[in-house]
């Protein structure tokens, strides 16, 4: 009798622990992913405006910088995330690509396709690359100890939150920052270049999430 009661107690305890963990683990929805992307766009634009104002004696405006896309030839976002009405030969193009991460829960079942899955995976890789670059630059800015400008933690948090929503399995690829110069001037110029490029990518990401959240 005691043995049966012990087994029943352990089974009940295990069930309650499992239920507690399930409730404690937040699961994103397309609507939440859209909210994350809107927050990303808002915080990125705020950081870009702050950089242009703070670094007014640097070539930091869109007209002055040398535009650079650090994701060029490394991710498929620009091709995979085309609006459906513009995408042609979707199955043929996407069949030769591989997805390194799961789509998380940003992609609703009714809009699942190989191209859209690749699009979300590419967005995740974009975010990972920019996150690595921004963290490296922020470390340099802090090391210079002039506190003229540092990255907004709200933007870095927004990047991390959207990455978590896109990658529920927690799979990551190691990234190495391209920043090599420790010269304060070059670091600030690099910051401006990255912020302009990332603000454009944030617009694309927000458009994709808006489409996935539409009826």
UniProtKB/Swiss-Prot annotation:
Pfam family, one: IL12
Keywords annotated in UniProt: Cytokine, Disulfide bond, Glycoprotein, Growth factor, Secreted, Signal
Signal peptide (UniProt feature, chain positions): 1-22
GO biological process assignments: immune response
Glycan attachment residues as annotated in the record: 89
Cysteine pairings via disulfide bonds: 33-106, 60-192, 81-119
GO molecular function: cytokine activity; growth factor activity; interleukin-12 receptor binding
Primary location: secreted
Functional summary from the UniProt entry: Heterodimerizes with IL12B to form the IL-12 cytokine or with EBI3/IL27B to form the IL-35 cytokine. IL-12 is primarily produced by professional antigen-presenting cells (APCs) such as B-cells and dendritic cells (DCs) as well as macrophages and granulocytes and regulates T-cell and natural killer-cell responses, induces the production of interferon-gamma (IFN-gamma), favors the differentiation of T-helper 1 (Th1) cells and is an important link between innate resistance and adaptive immunity.
Family stated for the protein in its record: Belongs to the IL-6 superfamily.
Name this protein carries in UniProt: Interleukin-12 subunit alpha
Source organism: Sigmodon hispidus (Hispid cotton rat)
